[in-house]
Curated annotation (Swiss-Prot):
It is an enzyme of class 3 (hydrolase). InterPro entries: RNase_HII, RNase_HII/HIII, RNase_HII/HIII_dom, RNaseH-like_sf, RNaseH_sf. The gene is rnhB. A divalent metal cation binds at residues 38-39, 132. Its cofactor is Mn(2+); Mg(2+). The lineage of its organism: Bacteria, Bacillati, Actinomycetota, Actinomycetes, Mycobacteriales. It comes from the Bacteria. Its main location: cytoplasm. Residues 32-223 form the RNase H type-2 domain. This is Ribonuclease HII.
Protein backbone atom coordinates (compact mmCIF):
# COMPACT_ATOMS: atom_id res chain seq x y z
CA UNK A 1 0.00 0.00 0.00
CA UNK A 2 1.34 3.41 -0.93
CA UNK A 3 2.14 5.61 2.04
CA UNK A 4 0.05 8.74 2.31
CA UNK A 5 2.04 11.95 2.30
CA UNK A 6 1.05 14.92 4.37
CA UNK A 7 -1.04 12.92 6.84
CA UNK A 8 -1.20 13.16 9.70
CA UNK A 9 -0.30 16.86 9.55
CA UNK A 10 2.72 17.89 11.61
CA UNK A 11 1.51 21.40 12.39
CA UNK A 12 -0.99 22.59 14.94
CA UNK A 13 -4.48 22.21 13.50
CA UNK A 14 -7.13 24.86 13.92
CA UNK A 15 -10.79 24.29 14.44
CA UNK A 16 -12.52 22.44 11.63
CA UNK A 17 -16.22 22.33 10.95
CA UNK A 18 -18.17 19.95 13.17
CA UNK A 19 -17.28 18.06 16.32
CA UNK A 20 -16.60 14.83 14.44
CA UNK A 21 -14.49 16.06 11.53
CA UNK A 22 -11.06 15.41 13.03
CA UNK A 23 -11.89 12.03 14.52
CA UNK A 24 -13.57 10.88 11.30
CA UNK A 25 -10.54 11.85 9.22
CA UNK A 26 -8.13 10.05 11.54
CA UNK A 27 -10.27 6.92 11.70
CA UNK A 28 -10.62 6.86 7.90
CA UNK A 29 -6.83 7.05 7.73
CA UNK A 30 -6.53 3.96 9.92
CA UNK A 31 -5.32 5.94 12.94
CA UNK A 32 -8.15 5.23 15.38
CA UNK A 33 -9.38 4.90 18.00
CA UNK A 34 -8.91 8.58 18.81
CA UNK A 35 -8.57 9.98 22.33
CA UNK A 36 -9.11 13.60 23.32
CA UNK A 37 -7.36 15.35 26.20
CA UNK A 38 -8.28 18.59 27.96
CA UNK A 39 -7.88 20.31 31.31
CA UNK A 40 -9.80 22.47 33.75
CA UNK A 41 -8.31 24.87 36.25
CA UNK A 42 -5.32 26.48 34.57
CA UNK A 43 -6.20 30.01 35.60
CA UNK A 44 -7.53 29.91 39.18
CA UNK A 45 -5.29 30.87 42.09
CA UNK A 46 -6.73 28.07 44.24
CA UNK A 47 -7.55 24.41 43.82
CA UNK A 48 -6.14 21.67 41.61
CA UNK A 49 -5.56 21.35 37.90
CA UNK A 50 -7.70 18.51 36.55
CA UNK A 51 -6.84 16.76 33.28
CA UNK A 52 -9.02 14.20 31.51
CA UNK A 53 -8.54 11.86 28.58
CA UNK A 54 -11.49 10.27 26.78
CA UNK A 55 -11.63 7.59 24.10
CA UNK A 56 -15.10 7.58 22.55
CA UNK A 57 -16.70 4.58 20.89
CA UNK A 58 -18.02 5.26 17.36
CA UNK A 59 -21.60 4.65 18.52
CA UNK A 60 -21.19 7.31 21.20
CA UNK A 61 -21.14 10.20 18.76
CA UNK A 62 -24.84 9.94 17.91
CA UNK A 63 -25.73 9.71 21.61
CA UNK A 64 -23.71 12.79 22.51
CA UNK A 65 -25.26 15.38 20.23
CA UNK A 66 -25.12 17.92 23.05
CA UNK A 67 -21.33 17.84 23.25
CA UNK A 68 -19.61 21.21 23.09
CA UNK A 69 -16.83 23.11 24.78
CA UNK A 70 -17.59 22.66 28.50
CA UNK A 71 -17.26 26.40 29.11
CA UNK A 72 -20.21 27.01 26.74
CA UNK A 73 -22.49 24.58 28.57
CA UNK A 74 -24.43 25.23 31.74
CA UNK A 75 -23.45 23.40 34.91
CA UNK A 76 -26.65 21.37 34.66
CA UNK A 77 -25.88 20.36 31.07
CA UNK A 78 -22.36 19.28 32.02
CA UNK A 79 -23.65 17.21 34.94
CA UNK A 80 -26.21 15.58 32.64
CA UNK A 81 -23.59 14.68 30.04
CA UNK A 82 -20.98 13.41 32.51
CA UNK A 83 -22.56 9.97 33.25
CA UNK A 84 -23.46 9.53 29.58
CA UNK A 85 -19.84 10.11 28.57
CA UNK A 86 -18.44 7.74 31.20
CA UNK A 87 -20.96 5.06 30.19
CA UNK A 88 -20.39 5.29 26.43
CA UNK A 89 -16.63 5.87 26.40
CA UNK A 90 -14.33 3.03 25.43
CA UNK A 91 -11.98 4.35 28.10
CA UNK A 92 -11.54 7.49 30.18
CA UNK A 93 -9.17 8.75 32.84
CA UNK A 94 -9.10 11.80 35.11
CA UNK A 95 -5.93 13.09 36.77
CA UNK A 96 -5.92 15.60 39.63
CA UNK A 97 -2.78 17.69 40.16
CA UNK A 98 -2.89 19.50 43.52
CA UNK A 99 -1.89 23.09 44.16
CA UNK A 100 1.40 22.13 45.84
CA UNK A 101 2.53 20.20 42.74
CA UNK A 102 1.57 23.11 40.48
CA UNK A 103 3.75 25.34 42.68
CA UNK A 104 6.62 22.86 42.48
CA UNK A 105 6.78 22.44 38.71
CA UNK A 106 4.77 25.34 37.22
CA UNK A 107 1.34 25.34 35.63
CA UNK A 108 2.46 24.58 32.07
CA UNK A 109 4.65 21.65 33.05
CA UNK A 110 1.84 20.42 35.33
CA UNK A 111 -0.56 20.63 32.38
CA UNK A 112 1.72 18.57 30.16
CA UNK A 113 2.45 16.03 32.90
CA UNK A 114 -1.27 15.70 33.61
CA UNK A 115 -1.99 15.00 29.94
CA UNK A 116 0.72 12.33 29.88
CA UNK A 117 -0.67 10.66 32.99
CA UNK A 118 -4.24 10.79 31.70
CA UNK A 119 -3.39 9.14 28.38
CA UNK A 120 -1.16 6.56 30.09
CA UNK A 121 -4.04 5.71 32.43
CA UNK A 122 -6.50 4.80 29.66
CA UNK A 123 -7.34 1.10 29.83
CA UNK A 124 -7.37 0.95 26.02
CA UNK A 125 -4.45 2.41 24.11
CA UNK A 126 -5.51 5.02 21.53
CA UNK A 127 -4.26 4.95 17.98
CA UNK A 128 -4.07 8.74 18.02
CA UNK A 129 -4.44 11.55 20.57
CA UNK A 130 -5.89 15.03 20.00
CA UNK A 131 -4.76 17.60 22.55
CA UNK A 132 -6.30 21.00 23.16
CA UNK A 133 -4.05 23.87 22.15
CA UNK A 134 -0.44 22.74 22.29
CA UNK A 135 1.87 19.83 21.59
CA UNK A 136 2.43 17.31 24.37
CA UNK A 137 5.69 15.35 24.05
CA UNK A 138 6.07 11.91 25.57
CA UNK A 139 2.59 10.54 24.92
CA UNK A 140 2.18 6.80 24.37
CA UNK A 141 0.57 7.39 20.95
CA UNK A 142 0.99 9.83 18.04
CA UNK A 143 -0.70 13.13 18.78
CA UNK A 144 -1.88 16.34 17.21
CA UNK A 145 -2.55 19.69 18.94
CA UNK A 146 -5.79 21.39 17.96
CA UNK A 147 -6.35 25.09 18.62
CA UNK A 148 -9.83 25.46 20.10
CA UNK A 149 -9.94 21.69 20.36
CA UNK A 150 -12.78 21.46 22.86
CA UNK A 151 -15.03 23.15 20.29
CA UNK A 152 -13.59 21.21 17.35
CA UNK A 153 -13.35 17.53 18.31
CA UNK A 154 -15.94 15.45 20.14
CA UNK A 155 -13.35 13.47 22.08
CA UNK A 156 -11.73 16.68 23.37
CA UNK A 157 -15.16 18.13 24.22
CA UNK A 158 -15.93 14.96 26.19
CA UNK A 159 -12.61 15.20 28.04
CA UNK A 160 -13.32 18.86 28.75
CA UNK A 161 -16.61 17.98 30.42
CA UNK A 162 -15.04 15.20 32.50
CA UNK A 163 -12.31 17.56 33.69
CA UNK A 164 -14.64 20.49 34.40
CA UNK A 165 -17.27 18.49 36.29
CA UNK A 166 -14.63 16.71 38.36
CA UNK A 167 -12.92 19.97 39.29
CA UNK A 168 -16.18 21.75 40.12
CA UNK A 169 -17.12 18.91 42.47
CA UNK A 170 -13.72 19.10 44.14
CA UNK A 171 -14.08 22.85 44.67
CA UNK A 172 -17.50 22.36 46.29
CA UNK A 173 -15.91 19.86 48.68
CA UNK A 174 -13.03 22.25 49.40
CA UNK A 175 -15.57 24.94 50.22
CA UNK A 176 -16.77 22.87 53.18
CA UNK A 177 -13.21 22.15 54.31
CA UNK A 178 -12.07 25.76 53.95
CA UNK A 179 -15.14 27.91 54.72
CA UNK A 180 -15.14 31.61 54.06
CA UNK A 181 -13.45 31.71 50.65
CA UNK A 182 -16.51 30.86 48.56
CA UNK A 183 -14.82 28.09 46.56
CA UNK A 184 -18.17 26.52 45.66
CA UNK A 185 -19.24 29.72 43.90
CA UNK A 186 -16.13 30.98 42.08
CA UNK A 187 -14.21 27.68 41.87
CA UNK A 188 -10.94 29.36 42.86
CA UNK A 189 -10.90 32.05 40.18
CA UNK A 190 -9.88 35.63 40.99
CA UNK A 191 -13.32 37.14 41.44
CA UNK A 192 -13.81 40.26 43.59
CA UNK A 193 -15.39 38.06 46.28
CA UNK A 194 -12.43 35.69 46.28
CA UNK A 195 -9.93 38.55 46.34
CA UNK A 196 -11.71 40.08 49.33
CA UNK A 197 -11.74 36.75 51.18
CA UNK A 198 -8.06 36.21 50.42
CA UNK A 199 -7.22 39.62 51.85
CA UNK A 200 -9.38 38.99 54.91
CA UNK A 201 -8.41 35.39 55.71
CA UNK A 202 -5.05 34.95 54.02
CA UNK A 203 -4.23 31.92 51.82
CA UNK A 204 -5.23 28.40 52.81
CA UNK A 205 -3.45 25.19 51.82
CA UNK A 206 -5.37 25.09 48.52
CA UNK A 207 -4.04 28.45 47.28
CA UNK A 208 -1.24 28.34 44.72
CA UNK A 209 1.83 30.01 46.21
CA UNK A 210 3.28 30.57 42.74
CA UNK A 211 0.40 32.91 41.80
CA UNK A 212 1.24 36.58 42.03
CA UNK A 213 -1.80 37.64 44.07
CA UNK A 214 -1.25 34.87 46.62
CA UNK A 215 2.44 35.67 46.98
CA UNK A 216 1.66 39.35 47.45
CA UNK A 217 -0.79 38.48 50.24
CA UNK A 218 1.99 36.46 51.89
CA UNK A 219 4.44 39.33 51.48
CA UNK A 220 6.60 37.38 49.01
CA UNK A 221 8.15 38.61 45.79
CA UNK A 222 6.27 37.56 42.63
CA UNK A 223 7.82 34.75 40.64
CA UNK A 224 8.68 35.21 36.98
CA UNK A 225 7.27 32.06 35.32
CA UNK A 226 9.16 32.86 32.11
CA UNK A 227 12.42 32.46 33.98
CA UNK A 228 11.37 29.86 36.55
CA UNK A 229 9.73 27.37 34.20
CA UNK A 230 10.93 28.01 30.66
CA UNK A 231 14.13 25.99 31.03
CA UNK A 232 12.22 22.96 32.30
CA UNK A 233 9.56 23.18 29.61
CA UNK A 234 12.03 23.64 26.78
CA UNK A 235 14.06 20.71 28.09
CA UNK A 236 10.95 18.57 27.62
CA UNK A 237 10.91 19.53 23.95
CA UNK A 238 7.81 21.68 24.03
CA UNK A 239 8.08 23.98 21.03
CA UNK A 240 4.67 25.57 21.33
CA UNK A 241 4.92 26.70 24.94
CA UNK A 242 2.43 28.74 26.93
CA UNK A 243 5.06 29.84 29.44
CA UNK A 244 5.10 33.45 28.28
CA UNK A 245 1.33 33.67 28.55
CA UNK A 246 1.46 32.18 32.04
CA UNK A 247 3.69 35.05 33.15
CA UNK A 248 0.55 37.12 33.48
CA UNK A 249 -1.69 34.41 34.93
CA UNK A 250 -2.34 36.28 38.14
CA UNK A 251 -2.28 39.81 36.84
Amino acid sequence: MTARTGWPPRMVMRKAGGLRTLEAALIRGGLGPVAGVDEAGRGPCAGPLVVAACLLAPKAYDRLAGLDDSKKLTEAAREELYPVITRLALAWEVVVIPAWEIDAIGIHVANIEGMRRAVAGLRQRPGYVLTDGFRVPGLAAPSLPVIGGDAAAACIAAASILAKVTRDRIMVELDSRHPGYGFAAHKGYNTPEHTAALQRLGPCSEHRRSWRNVRERLGLRPLDPTVEYAETVLADGVADSRVAADAAHAG
